[in-house]
A protein has these predicted regions:
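C-terminal motif of bacterial Sec signal peptides marking the signal peptidase cleavage site
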Residues: 5-9
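Short, well-ordered surface patches within globular domains
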Residues: 15-89, 130
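A well-ordered secondary-structure block
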Residues: 78-154
């Protein structure tokens, strides 16, 4: 017996970009959008993307597995980013294959220790973003890490 579960939004849509898959992801998207709206610049909203959340998850896995190996990290980063094609780019988050942020950066972070204000440090970069990718990865020792990336897909 096999059961297929399709997430459905309140309005009946099954579009993966319109259905946020879990409460933790929804909380991150809501927090980022509330902080943007409440900022002195009155920054715009970003919209959840299943596709870019998958890219974000791959980036987080690469960070977890290769952050001590800069060459491998950069090579894997390039492979992951290439999947986006030429019409999208990461504008906030893991934006550079040659810069491997430490855990103290606040993004990536241990779940519950994320510093969302780091997403707004460069408001001109934030203003380019229209999609948000959110990822959580549980490691073998049970620690859950999270990463948020903002994408310009226009």
């Amino acid at each position: 017996l096999c059961t297929v579960i399709h997430l459905t939004a309140c309005d009946g849509t099954t579009d993966p970009d319109k259905v946020i898959p879990d409460i933790d992801t929804a909380n991150v998207v809501d927090t980022v959008n509330h902080m943007a709206a409440d900022s002195k610049e009155g920054l715009g909203q970003v919209y959840y993307s299943a596709k870019y959340s998958e890219i974000t998850k791959e980036l987080l896995n690469n960070w977890l597995e290769n952050r001590e190996k800069s060459v491998t990290y950069a090579e894997e980063y390039q492979k992951i980013v290439a999947k986006m094609g030429g019409n999208a780019k990461i504008v906030v988050g893991l934006t550079d294959k040659n810069v491997i942020p430490g855990l103290t950066s606040g993004n990536p972070a241990v779940k519950g220790s994320a510093k969302y204000d780091v997403l707004f440090k460069d408001t001109s970069a934030y203003n380019l973003a229209d999609r948000i990718g959110v990822a959580f990865v549980k490691t073998e020792n049970g620690t859950v890490y999270q990463l948020v990336c903002l994408f310009d897909v226009n």
